[in-house]
A protein has these predicted regions:
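Long, low-complexity, compositionally biased intrinsically disordered regions
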Residues: 1-138
Length: 138
């Protein structure tokens, strides 16, 4: 599953602008708010707080953990646009009101701005992270 082309293009433009000037121009910030709505500003706050961690195992499997504003850690999968937070389940999956939640948007913005924390874990640690998420849900 992919984001709409306009969203993909906006994230590409943000990445290019940030690489050149180390900031995101106002027009792209407005575009972010237009496309992603109310989750744009909170997502930028998460990026500013360096709340996004890229977790990588030796086999190359990657997931992201985002420390939410509530202090809870959410697991995000950028490859399939999925987050374990309740807002994702409700606004994105059930109601189709949003493209994604603030946590996944923060992951994409952190990637674009090179603002991800990095964490190398063993395969066993990665498995434990994934299993812990399943227990939280069930």
């Amino acid at each position: 599953s992919t984001l709409p082309a306009v969203a993909e293009e906006l994230l590409r433009e943000i990445k290019m602008a940030f690489q050149e000037t180390s900031q995101v121009p106002d027009d792209l910030l407005l575009g972010l708010k237009f496309i992603f709505g109310p989750c744009a500003v909170p997502a930028l706050d998460l990026v500013d707080q360096r709340s996004v961690t890229r977790v990588r195992s030796p086999s190359g499997r990657i997931l992201y953990q985002v420390l939410g504003s509530s202090g809870k850690l959410y697991t995000c999968y950028s490859s399939c646009h999925f987050c374990t937070c309740p807002a994702f389940g409700f606004s994105v999956l059930q109601k189709s009101e949003s493209l994604l939640c603030k946590h996944i948007l923060a992951v994409y913005l952190s990637q674009a701005m090179g603002a991800c924390q990095e964490l190398a874990v063993s395969e066993e640690q990665l498995t434990n992270i994934l299993l812990a998420e399943e227990e939280d849900e069930g």
